[in-house]
Structure formats: C-alpha cells, structure tokens
C-alpha cells in the first residue's frame, strides 16, 4: 500500500508515459511505455516500449517503437495476455508517422498499426472494455510545440471507438462541441462500462468541460465546466472512476477534484502538493486512492477526504547542481516545483533530509555558493525572484535585476542563468536578453551588453501561446540568454549563450560583444546553447553544449 518501494527500472529510460500491469498475470508481466506525455517544452523523450515477464527483475525492449518518443497508453486484453494495444502520442517538436494505435497478437513479437490519423495527431489515451475486449476506445490529439510556442487542438482531434478489435473505427462525437477539439481525457466506469466520462478541450470556452455518456459513447451530455476540470488540459489530462460506483469521479489538475454525484458538482481533494498528474483507485478498496504530483506520491485511506504524502520514495527532479570546496563539500541544486536547497555530501550516520537547507521556493534552477563567503544565490522560475541567502542568519534578500524606466521589458528564460566570478568574488552575473552584472552581490546592477539574442519578434509572442487553451506560464519565453561564464583567467572575457542559437563573447568586460557561433562547425542555425564552461587552461578557450 505504499509503505515501501523498490526501484525496478533504473537501468533504462527515466521518462515514463505509461505503465500497464497484465490483469491475467499481475505479479510477473508489466509493460512500460516511455516518454513523458504531459507535453511541457522541457519534457524528456522516451526510447520505446519495454516488457518484463518476471515482475521487473529483467526487461526486454520491444522492437518497433524506437522512434515513438512518447507512449501515452498500453492496454492488455484481460482475457488474452498476448493481445496488447499501444497508443503512441509521438514527437513534440516535429511531424511523425510513428503516431497512432498499434496492436500485437503474439505478446509483442509483431505489431500492426491499426489506427493512424496524420503526422501531427497522436493517440493520447486508450481503453479496452474488460467485459467485451473487442471494444476499444482511443482519443487522438492534434498538437505541436516549438521552443517558443505551443498549439493544442485542431480539426483532427477526436475520440474513436472500435467494436471489432481495431479492424474498423468510428468517431463518437454526438453531443460533443462543434469546431476544433484539443486534448480529450476519458474514462469508463469499471462497474458499468457503458458509462463514459470525457473532459474535452474545445474551441469555445463555454463548451469546455466534463461530458457523460450512458450508452458507450453513442450520445454525450455536458455536465460541468468548473475551472479545475478544464485548466491546462495539455498538462492535466487524467480522469478516473471509482471501480465500485460510477458516480464517483476524480480528475487530476492543479489541486485535484472529486465528484460524488456523477459529475454534477466537484470538491477539491484533500490537501496535496499542487499539480496532480495521475490518480488511481485501489481496485479492491476504492476508499484508497493514490495520486502522483509534482511534490511526490500521495495516498488516501478515506476516499480522498484526506491525503498523506508517501515520504519514502525519492522522486525529486534536480534541474542543476553545483558544489563548494568545504570538507565535506556541499551540494547545491534547484528542484522542479520544489524549491532550491543545499546539503552536505556526507554526514556521520549518513545524510538525512533534515541536513538539507531550503534557500528558495517555486521551480528552483541554478543554486550557486558565493566563492568565499557563506552565502548562497538562488532563483525561481522565470526570475520571478532571485535571492541571496545567509544560512547563518536564516535570512534571504531579493536581488533580481529589474528593468530601468525606458528600457525594453526584460525577457528571462524559465531557467534563467546566473554566474559568479573566480577573480572578483562579490561579482555576480544574471541573464535576460541582456547580461546584467553586479559588483556587490546583487545590491546594484548594470547592463553590460546589448540584446545578445536574435530578438526575433515571431518568437517573443508568448502571450498567444497555447492553442485552444491560452497558456502563458513563461516557460516558453524565448530569445533569452541561457548560460553565462566569466573566464577564471581574465575577468574581461565573458561568454553568453542563448536559447535561439547565439554564442556571444566580450573581451573588454562588456564594452563590445562578438557573435562567434558561426565558428562552430556543423551546427544547425538557431540551435540552443545550453551551457558554456570557460577554460581554466586558456583564457580564450571555452566549451559549449548545444541541444
């Protein structure tokens, strides 16, 4: 029940889209589809489909899905373990013919693609009716992301049904909103599989919401359009039904919500960390609910009224780490949606959670120790705040650079860059589209560069991002500086790499800058520069990472 966990997949891809336990052999056969399907611009790709027949002791990579990138769903026929369906959502930034629904009749040895829409529309969910396994439902979602924009929805998004094991398919849209559709989350009631629920992203805001069918999808009726149901459908697209009661529905979202009257009204689930992405009922005791959130795994023993955190599973995600020269040295890092921290690399009896010190909130990214003083720099997403933290006093001071009157609005990357100086310890750098420099640990700032990005107006309209559901979190901010490095051998040499493909360098402390990206052989235009490391051996040398 979550009391203990053991890792069984660490040697393989760590980005997971779907886990399916074979209903006929749950102790041994597990399928894993890789690639995260909550399509933020920073999610990792998968490398295909895996299967174990010994409960996770060993895994076989299944041929045919190497280019799938994101597998949204795996479904096993409960009456025939060799019959398996796989829904491939597919590539995030490009066209892909690997999208669609696939089927095997021999346990994964051979596959047939049984439903395909086009290169831009992938399968976002699948369901096999356990009472009639030839009945299969599949939702398809048309979407496309670029580094600076996201578009959810189109004419090809749809919910399909097959009653002959995938030989033929039909859209089941009677009662759906007119016009373009986006992501469709759906589920069937285990106690009565004729009852279906779907949360639909639609062209009109008034049409978005929860729909119900009582005849296997032949007809649909809208029930509810509460904010928590429709918020960020590309990111929160999971709905589950109580296995005993078709009128109890839970929906993932910012806080998670539950209905006990068939979807007419919803209440917030018990307190959890925000951003709930997955929820499941215990099939033997539906009062027990598990939730996967940005803050970890939670469980409920009382049908969602209260939720408790499962604190024995390490699932935090570090964006970036740094270290100091203490003995033992300390490790500094920012966590996805869980703040910024530092802690010792070793401790008598082992490092414990209580040894770690929080130095920031929100999405942390870079956390840097002052080179000579016991101070720590940290930030949150989009440079909404930048801090200088004094651990001895347990005090933090806000120090982020601000736009000067008359200057253009500052564009900060979601993971904005900061850097310290090995030559002048109190010097601190921060990046927007400009390089900002402070000589007094962030008390005052000066710009030492012009706009070092391409400043492409097409790529700086994040207010229009989202498609059918406007989404302007700041994560798509583009034409920004992503990495800064001062030479440890010459304080006048400073490097800056941008997310839109520039490498700029100054040799005179910021008076003049030169874009040297053309000197990188074989680099495609506009390739993001993710990191620059100035050499400790040659003052004109640097190492760069691109993606």
What role is predicted for each listed range?
Residues 1-547:
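Beta-propeller blade termini and top-face loops
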């Amino acid at each position: 029940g979550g009391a203990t966990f053991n890792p069984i997949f660490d040697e393989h891809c760590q980005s997971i889209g779907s886990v399916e336990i074979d209903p006929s052999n749950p102790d041994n056969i597990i399928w894993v589809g890789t690639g995260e399907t909550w399509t933020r611009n920073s999610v990792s790709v998968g490398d295909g489909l895996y299967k174990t027949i010994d409960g996770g002791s060993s895994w076989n990579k299944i041929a045919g899905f190497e280019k799938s990138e994101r597998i949204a769903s795996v479904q096993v026929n409960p009456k025939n373990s060799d019959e398996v369906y796989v829904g491939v959502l597919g590539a995030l930034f490009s066209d892909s013919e690997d999208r669609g629904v696939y089927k095997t009749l021999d346990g994964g040895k051979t596959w047939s693609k049984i439903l395909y829409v086009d290169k831009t529309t992938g399968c976002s969910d699948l369901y096999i009716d356990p009472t009639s396994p030839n009945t299969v439902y599949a939702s398809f979602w048309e979407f496309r992301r670029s580094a600076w924009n996201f578009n959810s929805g189109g004419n090809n998004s749809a919910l399909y049904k097959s009653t002959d094991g995938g030989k033929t398919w039909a859209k089941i849209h009677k009662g759906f909103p007119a016009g373009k559709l986006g992501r469709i989350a759906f589920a069937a009631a285990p106690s009565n599989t004729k009852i279906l629920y779907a949360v639909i992203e639609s062209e009109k805001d008034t049409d978005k919401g929860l729909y119900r069918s009582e005849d296997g999808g032949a007809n649909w009726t809208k029930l509810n359009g509460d904010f928590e149901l429709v918020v960020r459908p590309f990111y929160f697209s999971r709905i589950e039904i109580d296995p005993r009661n078709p009128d109890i529905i839970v929906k993932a979202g910012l806080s998670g919500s539950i209905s006990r009257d068939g979807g007419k009204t919803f209440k917030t689930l018990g307190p959890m960390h925000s951003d709930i992405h997955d929820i499941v009922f215990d099939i033997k005791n539906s009062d027990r609910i598990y939730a996967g959130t940005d803050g970890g795994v939670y469980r409920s023993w009382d049908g969602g009224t209260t939720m408790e955190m499962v604190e024995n599973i390490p699932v935090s995600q570090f964006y970036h780490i740094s270290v100091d020269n203490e003995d033992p040295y300390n490790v500094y890092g920012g966590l996805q949606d869980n703040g910024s921290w530092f802690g010792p690399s070793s401790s008598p009896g082992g490092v414990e959670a209580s040894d770690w010190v929080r130095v920031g909130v929100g999405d942390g990214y870079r956390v840097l120790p002052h080179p000579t003083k016991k101070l720590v720099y940290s930030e949150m997403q989009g440079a909404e705040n930048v801090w200088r933290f004094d651990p001895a006093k347990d005090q933090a001071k806000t120090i982020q650079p601000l736009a000067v009157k008359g200057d253009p609005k500052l564009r900060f990357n979601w993971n904005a860059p900061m850097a310290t100086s090995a030559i002048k310890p109190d010097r601190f750098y921060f990046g927007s589209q400009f390089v900002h420099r402070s000589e007094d640990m962030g008390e005052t700032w000066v710009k030492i560069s012009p706009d070092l990005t391409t400043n492409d107006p097409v790529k700086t309209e994040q207010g229009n991002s989202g498609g059918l559901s406007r989404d302007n979190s700041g994560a798509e901010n583009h034409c920004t500086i992503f990495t800064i490095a001062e030479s440890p051998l010459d304080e006048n040499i400073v490097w800056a790499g941008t997310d839109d493909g520039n490498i700029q360098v100054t040799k005179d402390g910021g008076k003049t800058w030169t874009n040297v990206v053309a000197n990188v052989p074989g680099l495609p235009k506009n390739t993001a520069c993710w990191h620059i490391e100035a050499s400790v051996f040659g003052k004109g040398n640097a190492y760069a990472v691109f993606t």
